[in-house]
Curated annotation (Swiss-Prot):
NCBIfam families: glk (TIGR00749), PRK00292.1-1 (NF001414), PRK00292.1-3 (NF001416), PRK12408.1 (NF009073). GO terms for cellular component: cytosol. PANTHER family: GLUCOKINASE. The lineage of its organism: Bacteria, Pseudomonadati, Pseudomonadota, Gammaproteobacteria, Enterobacterales. Belongs to the bacterial glucokinase family. ATP binds at residues 8-13. It is found in: Cytoplasm. GO terms for molecular function: ATP binding; D-glucose binding; glucokinase activity. This is Glucokinase. It comes from Salmonella arizonae (strain ATCC BAA-731 / CDC346-86 / RSK2980). SUPFAM superfamilies: Actin-like ATPase domain.
Length: 321
């Protein structure tokens, strides 16, 4: 008889829940709920389990916020809860609450070739560290290492490191944004809001007033080639994505590969392929040759957060991935 666990991927707007076959890791019965419609995450879980008439003992839910202890308070939502109390209330034997990029990193060993698009570099080296990052509402970062037959995710808040310009244009962007907001982190330029910041800074650098555009407006105009400022912003976004990925590669020697997740890049995939991304990735001066062979992959799996939550839980329960 198949034994299932509950897995989830929760952001600021939606909660996506599914079942994971504990033996195989296969994800099924995925359903998305609006977080605005429920008073708590526990309430959403109860509705899901009732709707699917399934009894589970174990669960793992990825959430887009730092997980530093038993108390979880979501960054972009009013939900807050005790992991221990929620586990008790649901009658679970195991309940793991992990960072969303911990989940994405744990999905990597489960991905197949059709779930990836490669951008340069050679073949990944088995057993070497892996980096994963992705731009969406914010900039998520994690690393993954393989130790004693176990995958260990190294989560953190790497998206909030300093933005490090490496050209006159990027230095100009930093100067303008720093005058507006003070500290300029990588996330301030590598995210949906970050794309808007790039556009605004480009326009302001020419002593003009920027329009009130949303990220999707900038992307659409750039792809239609109807706005030179938008096209410059998107081009610069791609280059800085490359620089940041190269920084991650240098930091931990990620010869196992660098992986890009998140919802932004797939929206302009062909533009990204032709951009200066890989050039930015390898623009490391004396260490250009060091990163030259490191492959970069774009994850195109529909639900890496659910897949990784399942992988994390299965490993916790003693399965070898």
């Amino acid at each position: 008889m198949t034994k299932y666990a509950l897995v989830g991927d929760v952001g600021g707007t939606n909660a996506r829940l599914a079942l994971c076959d504990i033996a195989s890791g296969e994800i099924s019965q995925a359903k998305t709920y609006s977080g605005l419609d429920y008073p708590s995450l526990e309430a959403v879980v109860r509705v899901y389990l009732d709707e699917h008439s399934v009894s589970v003992e174990d669960g793992c839910i990825a959430i887009a916020c730092p997980i530093t202890g038993d108390w979880v308070a979501m960054t972009n939502h009013t939900w807050a809860f005790s992991i221990a109390e929620m586990k008790k209330n649901l009658g679970f034997s195991h309940l793991e609450i992990i960072n969303d990029f911990t989940a994405v990193s744990m999905a990597i060993p489960m991905l197949k070739k059709e779930h990836l698009i490669q951008f340069g570099g050679g073949e990944p080296v088995d057993g070497k560290p892996i980096a994963v990052y992705g731009a969406g509402t914010g900039l998520g970062v994690a690393h993954l290492v393989h130790v004693d037959k176990r995958w260990i995710s190294l989560p953190g808040e790497g998206g909030h490191v300093d933005f490090a310009p490496n050209s006159e244009e990027e230095a100009m962007i930093l100067e303008i944004l720093r005058a507006e907001i003070g500290h300029v982190s990588a996330e301030r330029v590598l995210s949906g809001p970050g794309l808007v910041n790039l556009y605004r800074a480009i326009v302001k650098s020419d002593n003009r007033l920027p329009e009130n555009l949303r990220p999707k407006d900038i992307t659409a105009r750039a792809l239609a080639d109807s706005c030179i400022d938008c096209r410059r912003a998107l081009s610069l976004f791609c280059v800085i994505m490359g620089r940041f990925g190269g920084d991650l590669a240098l930091t931990l020697g990620t010869f196992g590969g660098v992986y890009i997740a998140g919802g932004i890049v797939p929206r302009f995939l062909e533009f990204f392929k032709a951009s200066g991304f890989r050039g930015g990735f390898e623009d490391k001066g004396r260490f250009k040759d060091y990163v030259h062979s490191i492959p970069v992959y774009l994850i195109v799996h529909d639900n890496p957060g659910l897949l990784g939550s399942g992988a994390h839980l299965r490993q916790t329960l003693g399965h070898i991935l």
